[in-house]
């Protein structure tokens, strides 16, 4: 899959570093996800009043909505250290044991993509989360014996885009489950304005709204689009970001007013023009546009469904009447019979 301007995953190391500079450090600075903020504030204050580690927290939802940011905020609000790792990087039980053994009382351990840890590693997590201990097997064969090592109380914050892929025993060990949803226009506009202030760029209110509109409900994409519009403004408009420059830049980037790019259009057109709007199987669509099935399912499909452009049925994927309207394709009802 080629890098997309509307990809809600981080693209490269440079973008990782730049995003870190934009992240808030306190709940009061965090924009959006209001119910989550309110609940977390109560849970954190209660844990501090009892002088206990915060219950383990599971953050789930689409990429780019602030799960890593929230994990860091939790650590800041608790005034403790945070250790950051990811599911794929914990290959063996010993890797996890080493990380857990390095934690101090109250620390936060953040595991991104926690759904990707192996079942063998998961087994080590169970007693660590439940009883704050490690069960280590020493020796081999008949001489093998289990040794229990006590751990200081800690908070595990797990993040995933695929909560359904977590095993039930692991999921049930999280005391706090928080789902992050796509952002509304008001909160996204606030984020674009704040980022513009950080970058010290001049931008009008219409441009803020236009960038927010095309950001797929995702702060990471909003910030990325602002950076690219800033590039166009710097080269072609003396650094001024007005609505004319913004519209021109976003159109050149092939991001429409639904936040769809050329690949989204390609998917919808394949369903409509080649398969009469569906239903059509995901494998068939993948072959038609030259993408992998898992990429379609995880990256492209969720937003198209969320925008009401695509339906997932038992017989396959179906383009909705809204997809026809958006692409200016005549909708003939007989096609669907």
From Swiss-Prot:
GO biological process: DNA recombination; DNA repair
Annotated region (Small ATPAse domain (RuvB-S)), positions in chain: 184-254
UniProt-annotated binding residues for DNA: 293, 312, 317
Keywords assigned by UniProt, alphabetized: ATP-binding, Cytoplasm, DNA damage, DNA recombination, DNA repair, DNA-binding, Hydrolase, Nucleotide-binding
Enzyme class: hydrolase
Recorded GO MF terms: ATP binding; ATP hydrolysis activity; four-way junction DNA binding; four-way junction helicase activity
Annotated stretches, region: Large ATPase domain (RuvB-L): 1-183
Region feature (Head domain (RuvB-H)): 257-337
Positions with a binding annotation for ATP: 22-23, 64, 67-69, 130-132, 173, 183, 220
Record field: catalytic activity: ATP + H2O = ADP + phosphate + H(+)
Record keyword DNA damage present: yes
Residues annotated for Mg(2+) binding in this entry: 68
Alphabetized NCBIfam families for the sequence: PRK00080.1, ruvB
Assembly and binders: Homohexamer. Forms an RuvA(8)-RuvB(12)-Holliday junction (HJ) complex. HJ DNA is sandwiched between 2 RuvA tetramers; dsDNA enters through RuvA and exits via RuvB. An RuvB hexamer assembles on each DNA strand where it exits the tetramer. Each RuvB hexamer is contacted by two RuvA subunits (via domain III) on 2 adjacent RuvB subunits; this complex drives branch migration. In the full resolvosome a probable DNA-RuvA(4)-RuvB(12)-RuvC(2) complex forms which resolves the HJ.
HAMAP family reported in the protein's UniProt record: DNA_HJ_migration_RuvB (MF_00016)
Function description: The RuvA-RuvB-RuvC complex processes Holliday junction (HJ) DNA during genetic recombination and DNA repair, while the RuvA-RuvB complex plays an important role in the rescue of blocked DNA replication forks via replication fork reversal (RFR). RuvA specifically binds to HJ cruciform DNA, conferring on it an open structure. The RuvB hexamer acts as an ATP-dependent pump, pulling dsDNA into and through the RuvAB complex. RuvB forms 2 homohexamers on either side of HJ DNA bound by 1 or 2 RuvA tetramers; 4 subunits per hexamer contact DNA at a time.
PANTHER family: HOLLIDAY JUNCTION BRANCH MIGRATION COMPLEX SUBUNIT RUVB, PTHR42848
Domain notes: Has 3 domains, the large (RuvB-L) and small ATPase (RuvB-S) domains and the C-terminal head (RuvB-H) domain. The head domain binds DNA, while the ATPase domains jointly bind ATP, ADP or are empty depending on the state of the subunit in the translocation cycle. During a single DNA translocation step the structure of each domain remains the same, but their relative positions change.
Family classification: Belongs to the RuvB family.
Protein name: Holliday junction branch migration complex subunit RuvB
Provenance organism: Macrococcus caseolyticus (strain JCSC5402)
